[in-house]
Amino acid sequence: MNLIEFPLLDQTSSNSVISTTPNDLSNWSRLSSLWPLLYGTSCCFIEFASLIGSRFDFDRYGLVPRSSPRQADLILTAGTVTMKMAPSLVRLYEQMPEPKYVIAMGACTITGGMFSTDSYSTVRGVDKLIPVDVYLPGCPPKPEAVIDALTKLRKKISREIVEDQTLSQNKNRFFTTSHKLYVRRSTHTGTYEQELLYQSPSTLDISSETFFKSKSPVPSYKLVN
């Protein structure tokens, strides 16, 4: 090649050649185009909605919200997760293609929040249902904290290895966190919940004789002391 015909070749060739590995290229493409599935159930999701505006502009991170779990690789849980919603959340996570990531946003998602002390219907930590990659505490977290969590997740993706991802997929990825909880005495001191177990019989279950007998007037001699 004649360098006289291409005098700028030696100056631009060093900037046009990229040397990398397939693993790093895959990580770079995934961290630059995260497609989140927004699972918001409470007030924490309102703070995440602030990122859509022009002040924070979460599009610069390549985030494209999706409405289907089959098209998402990131699920962001924000808010309280109840026992009734737990199977739906696990089903959404299982429908996401690998590799997939989870961000737990807010105190209610991480530990149950103010419902964790004495609630019969609240999941005390979403990591009991699905594995969590980044914990974002707060009540609620600010939009700047959400951006910091996304940055930490991008750094985690950049250090991943394909072989490690394959091994993690074959293992049981649920119940990844063992909480150090202390058993305390229940705060239920009354019997106010027992009345819910008693249901008065309907009029269809009562015979006509018993019904009219109960409706009969009280004799006058029973009114006298």
Swiss-Prot record:
Pfam families, A to Z: Oxidored_q6
Protein's gene: ndhK
Binding site for [4Fe-4S] cluster: 43-44, 108, 139
HAMAP family xref list: NDH1_NuoB
Note accompanying the cofactor annotation: Binds 1 [4Fe-4S] cluster.
Keyword vocabulary terms for this entry: 4Fe-4S, Chloroplast, Iron, Iron-sulfur, Membrane, Metal-binding, NAD, NADP, Plastid, Plastoquinone, Quinone, Thylakoid, Translocase, Transport
EC id: 7.1.1.-
Gene Ontology terms for molecular function: 4 iron, 4 sulfur cluster binding; iron ion binding; NADH dehydrogenase (ubiquinone) activity; quinone binding
Its job: NDH shuttles electrons from NAD(P)H:plastoquinone, via FMN and iron-sulfur (Fe-S) centers, to quinones in the photosynthetic chain and possibly in a chloroplast respiratory chain. The immediate electron acceptor for the enzyme in this species is believed to be plastoquinone. Couples the redox reaction to proton translocation, and thus conserves the redox energy in a proton gradient.
Cofactor(s) listed: [4Fe-4S] cluster
The keyword Flavoprotein appears for this protein: no
PANTHER family: NADH DEHYDROGENASE, NADH DEHYDROGENASE [UBIQUINONE] IRON-SULFUR PROTEIN 7, MITOCHONDRIAL
Species this chain originates from: Lolium perenne
Record GO biological process: aerobic respiration; electron transport coupled proton transport; photosynthesis, light reaction
Single GO cellular component term: respiratory chain complex I
Localization (cell): Plastid, Chloroplast thylakoid membrane
Protein name listed in UniProt: NAD(P)H-quinone oxidoreductase subunit K, chloroplastic
Membrane-topology descriptor: Peripheral membrane protein
Main location: plastid
Similarity annotation: Belongs to the complex I 20 kDa subunit family.
Reactions catalysed according to its record: a plastoquinone + NADH + (n+1) H(+)(in) = a plastoquinol + NAD(+) + n H(+)(out); a plastoquinone + NADPH + (n+1) H(+)(in) = a plastoquinol + NADP(+) + n H(+)(out)
Signal peptide (residue range): none
Subunit structure, interactors included: NDH is composed of at least 16 different subunits, 5 of which are encoded in the nucleus.
